[in-house]
Amino acid sequence: MGKELEKEKTVIIDDPMTPVPLNQRQHWTAPAFIFGGLEFSVTLLMIGSTLIGAFGLKGIIPVVLFTFICLTWVGNAISGYMGAKTGLSSSVIAKQGFGDKQAKFIIALVIGVISMGWWAVQTSVTGNAFCAVLGIDYTVNRTAWMITTIVAGIVFAIPSVIGYSSMKWTDYFAVPGGILLCIVGIYLALKNIGWSNIISYKGSGEISFAAGVTMILGMNVSQFVISADYTRYAKPCWKDNILRPIGIVAIGIPLLFIGAIMGAGNGTADIVAVMENLGFPIWGFIVLWLAAWTSQLVNNYTMGLSFSNMLNIKTNKGRAIVTAVGTFLSLLLCFTGILENLQKLLSLAALLYPAIAGVMFVDFFLRKGVWEDKQGWNFMATIAMIVGIAVGYITTYIVVIGIPPAQSLIITGITYYVIMKVKAKVAPDKFTEGIN
């Protein structure tokens, strides 16, 4: 009987709407490893290749360190604590500040669609890599590329359809494979280009410091919202949540520099083209697929959770079905040429995620970390989010100033705090309950 009870306790609850019980919470290193897998993405290598073209190798050092240590670490720690404290996924936590209707049909949709976009981008890159292995010119033979992309996508999706427990074990062997890829990439770059040429490489100066930070943050800012999807399996203490982003920083910083070193002098951000130019062996492209697998799991799993919340799916079986259907739709996105629109996807994420995070952060701490499912639609959250998105858009495209994602998050948070405080005094309702 004792063994049966112990076995029952170790079974992971993966229902999208159910808080993870405290007796099933894990050591902080488990979600940290998953975060490392999330950060270990082909997209980050591509961003590194882009940044060295603008800044040179020495010039990207302050950009990378500031983004990861001052912004990414802090945002992830806060978001992670929210998930650990409540045991809930991000799209469910959002119900308190936004109201269940808004969280279902706007927040879950935004998170789900952008996660689909990221998944489609990296699956497209992997299709390119498989074509390189098979000696197929993926720029000409699109039928063969589509077939290889479908195969890669199906394999990518299987662990995320199964659930959290299989994702953890996949990362345990996929991350080392990605590290091997990077080591070989550095070796070939040094062999073909030479360290002196890499270190002295001069960037074009076409991208400002703030724009470089925004580019990196555009990829990572989604974590300010979705971290809770994985930290809900962790213990709810601040120490663990401060340590947990180590997985992101320890992988992200080196990976960006590796992408930069590999891309020096190549004149392209297409990582497959860069690898071909460097003379990567065939197995390197297979390892590229393995490295991409880690972040693909997170993108697909988050997409499934978000759409499950939107459709009010409450079982693990239902979540798995939703994730599988979402995978099919994501494959269709691959064939629309989303890889050529990577910068647009980064910009969209940089506009939407900070505004969502701003409301969620402030609402959570206004209520002192006590979560309650709020029915309806909180228009104060809508107003704050619109203000934040507007600030992000204006400072990105019209009056280019500062770091738009950070500004959007801060302005959204301040706006939400002020109008909720005023509403609590002037016209209190269920959304102002618990706000003093």
Kindly give the residue locations of the regions a language model identified:
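Juxtamembrane transmembrane-helix boundary signature
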Residues: 65-98, 107-117, 121, 421-428
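C-terminal membrane-solvent junction of multi-pass transporters and transport-like membrane proteins
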Residues: 25, 319-320, 356-418, 422-436
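Hydrophobic, membrane-embedded alpha-helices of multi-pass small-molecule transporters
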Residues: 28-45, 187-192, 201-262, 278-297, ...
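Membrane-interface "cap" regions at the ends of multi-pass membrane proteins
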Residues: 1-61, 207-213, 232-242, 422-436
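Membrane-interface loop-to-helix entry segments
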Residues: 147-188, 203-204, 244-247, 346-357, ...
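Membrane-water interface regions at transmembrane-helix termini and the short interhelical loops
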Residues: 53-54, 81, 97, 128-137, ...
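Transmembrane alpha-helical segments of multi-pass small-molecule transport proteins
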Residues: 35-37, 108-109, 135-162, 176-186, ...
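Hydrophobic alpha-helical segments and their helix-loop junctions in multi-pass secondary transporters
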Residues: 160, 176-201, 216-220, 259-264, ...
